[in-house]
Amino acid sequence: MRYCGLLLALPLCAQVQDRTYNLLRENDDWSFLADPSQRSDFWDPIKYVPLGCNACYVSFGGEIREAFEQVGNDNWGKQRYSNTFLLQRYMLHADWHVGKNFRFFVQLKSGVEDFRAGGPRPIDEKRLDFETAFLEVGNTHKKNWAVLRTGRQELNYGSGRLVSVREGPNVRQSFDGVKIRAKAGEWNIDAWAVRPDLDKPGFFNNTPDHTTAFWGLYATRPWRRRVSCDLYYLGLDRKNAAFERGSATELRHTIGARLWRPVAKEEPASDFDYEGVVQLGSFGSGDIRAWTFASDTGYTFTNVPLRPRFSIKADISSGDNPGSHTLGTFSPIYPIGNYFGVLADTGPGPVNFIDVHPRMQAQLPHGVSISADVVVQWRENVDDGVYAVPGFLLVAANGSRARFVGYRPGAEVRWQIDRHAYLQADYGIFYAGQFLKEASPGRNINYVELWAGYKF
């Protein structure tokens, strides 16, 4: 019986700990490395450095990312040259835990751009500054808890369609303000009031954007059969917000719900991500009435070679009729940079659009994955133009009644060399449709990007 007990205990002792590098590095948890027997990675000695008191330690980490980008006919030919440039990202963080009730997290960022014709965009370059620097007070090691966080921080919720750290571009998005995180039963709830951080090309000179205020409440919980639901409210107050109809002060209230099931990892199964949003508020002396619905439905065959996943996205968001007193243009607020895959920072965004987006993914041996997709896009309202991913106007309607914007086939190859390093290549062509041919030079966008990254 004694030997049986030892055998039963072995799986518990050999339990594999989570060594995931999260999108938000503040969510990395290396406390299990307090046990020296768990230390097996080269970087483990700096992942848990005890500070002498109970539950007191500091953890260090970082990231290096190099990207070669080439864009031909940017903005469908408004810039006809082939623009080739290099983007470099360097990030370093430290996470101090003082007991179970106090935590200080600081993350430095440096984004550098070289060789781009026209110079760096705001998303390309930030010489050196704090990406995050916050103090958190409260104990999360309870069944129900609440903690207060104040300082510079990142926000990322749900699928990232509306609130994201802007991971694709070279410089990530951060905010200055306060946030309360809480757990009540099965609900995880966040509430915040912040201002976006303005990235200026220089050293430690970022400031909050005092023309914009952003606040919200986001709640999520598991439901049943691997399905979870999110409910949220987002508030945005912007001075001089710009749309095709003009510029004015914008007060926008966003109410949304999301139902989702993650991609299958063990047994063959379907996955989905459905999200519906309405937006109300005021724009100048008029009102705001906007909406969107987004869907992503897939199936993963985990029991066949290459573990393929086939999926299709279908999305729609409202556009504007400038002749009415009500602004109908949907705002993506702070969206994910690569929601449409390749062409993330140069193609059209999820504003005034209808799209169908089939995709295929497969897992090859030795950590290599491949994907291929096609995005086909139309305008929802022919009186409104085409907008970029962040929501600013790219091509005005210019009287065109054509609805078809174009289509973009693309492909991606990624080699996850080990848990730290990866190489990736993206390629896409956006073929201009009838609207772009009528309202712009209408040339096809060619896009190539090569990535190399390392996290620790």
Question: Where are the regions that the model predicts?
Answer:
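Sec-dependent signal peptide recognition
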Residues: 1-7
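N-terminal periplasmic/intermembrane-space "pro-region" immediately following the signal or transit peptide
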Residues: 12-82, 122, 306, 310, ...
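Extracellular/periplasmic loop regions
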Residues: 16-40, 276, 286-399
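Residues on the lipid-exposed face of transmembrane beta-strands in outer-membrane beta-barrel proteins
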Residues: 62, 92-96, 132-137, 178-182, ...
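Transmembrane beta-strands of outer-membrane beta-barrel pores
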Residues: 64-72, 108-114, 152-156, 184-186, ...
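Surface-exposed loop and membrane-interface regions of Gram-negative outer-membrane beta-barrel proteins
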Residues: 70-88, 98-144, 161-165, 202, ...
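Signature for the C-terminal beta-barrel architecture of outer-membrane proteins
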Residues: 141-148, 161-323, 383, 395-411, ...
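Predominantly the C-terminal beta-signal and adjacent terminal strand-loop region
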Residues: 418-451, 455-456
